[in-house]
Each structure stands twice: as structure tokens, then as C-alpha cells.
Amino acid sequence: MVTAEEIESAYTAWAQANDDVRAAFVVGSRARVDHPADAWADLDIIMFARDADRYHETIDWIRAFAPLWIALAGRTAGGDPERLVLFAGGLQVDFVFHPDTHLAGLPQFLATGPLPDDIVRGTRVLVDKEGVLAQLPPPGRPSAPQPPDSATFRQALEGFWFAAVYAAKQLRRGELWPFQNASSGMTGGLLQMVAWHACALSGGDCDTWHGGKFVAEWAREGVYADLQGVFSRLEVEDGRRAMRVRMALYSRLAREVAAELDLSYPTELEQQITATVERIMDGKDKA
């Protein structure tokens, strides 16, 4: 199995010899100091080239590094072109492509901020033919997220409870796969509340990462243990159990956040929706 170090070395030599490639750096766990890469980590490379589209649209240049299994073309969440590459043996390498013209704006981008978390957490320069990547910041910790204001908090609450009613209907129908899909609206909202709770009860001294990474470390004491019951098997009864765990935990955390941040809490709305969800799950509401 090819290693990340071998791919990085081969890529760097290729990029240094290729005049079209002007800059490249590593982000993610293989550039971080805090929670660095483990044996299963992928390699994330951001590259700048004069003809960036060519590298997105072709894979011949990737094949030169190691035996290749898969090279999926797509776009990042931010809309940047990328290739998700799987080399023989299982190593994943993600290439993100930018035109070299973006390098001219990098100093201003770094100076004005706020910077993306993956840049703040650490970068490692591979190629810097234009001499601009030296301005990348040293590894650090992102600023704590801003606490929710009243409108943001209320919107989050309504999103969770809306998802609860929708998921309950799928469960009542016995549509267990759609129920699992619908449950993501609840679990996603719950994760957001876990993060707000961690920050609110620590006075803002928190690092909640992204997408639930390391949640066992940053959630407040006891919360991670409570999260163990929020997912269910493809069974109606276990779905009911998970629904009740999610609603009870969300309610408790949200109320504690509201109290800590001096936000109003819609107790009556929660009670009405909780009762409705119970009626639906128990079959007391007709479809």
C-alpha cells in the first residue's frame, strides 16, 4: 500500500518540475499540530496552477504517482473544483484546484479574515514558486463560535421540532429508511445544540471542531454518554426509543443554553410538539 508520505514526495517533485504548477500546500490532519493524522487520515492538497481546469478534468498526471483505483471529479462545499482520489491499497488524497491568479489575492485574504478553520489549524507548504505561501499563519486554534442570538436560537429550535414531527410520521408509517433520512434533521440540530451548550457553559472557552469530530472530548461532561442512544436500528420500537432520547436530550441542553445566554425558551411550543410526536408514534393520530 502506498503511503501518504510517498504520494506527497512524488507530488512535490512533480509539481516542482512542472512550471504550470505555481504553489501547493497541505491542510487537514496531515498539517495539524492539534489532533494530527492517524494511520487512516487522508491527504488534502490545495494547488494553484496556470491551467487549473486541466488538472481537474484529467487524471493522467495522478496515475504517475502510484497505482490508481478511483479519481472522482467534483466540487468542495465551497464550490471549488476537486478530485477525490483513492490509490491502490486505500490511501485517499483530495486535490483542490485554484487558478494561479488567486495567489495575488492571498495576502489580502489572510490579512482581512476570518480564515477558514482548516487554514487556522495548520498548513504545510509543498511548493511556493511565487513566494506568497510564507504568509500562511502558523498552526493555531480557531476563534470560538459566536453564541446564538435570539433569532438564531429560535430558528434552530423550530428546525429541530419540525424535523421531529416529520420523522415521527415516517416512523408511524413503518417507512424505516425514510425515517432514518428524516432523523438527520434531528441529529444535525442536536449536534449544533451540543456545541452551543459546550460553549455557553464554558464561558466561550471552547473548540467544537466540525461535523462532530472529537465530540467525545469537547462535549460537556455526561453529554457524550447521553448521545449514545440517539441513533436507532431499522426497527419501529427502537425508532420510538431513539426519538424520545433525542427529544429529551435536546430539550435539556436547549433549556440550559437559554438560561446561560438569557434567551427566551418556547416551553409551550415544545410541549405541544412533544405531545403530537407521542400521539403519532403511538398510533393515536390517524394518517
Name each model feature, range by range:
Residues A64-R173, P178, S183, G189:
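Conserved NTP/Mg2+-binding pocket subregion across the NTase superfamily
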Residues A37, I62, G122-R124, E130, ...:
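Generic secondary-structure boundary/loop-capping signal
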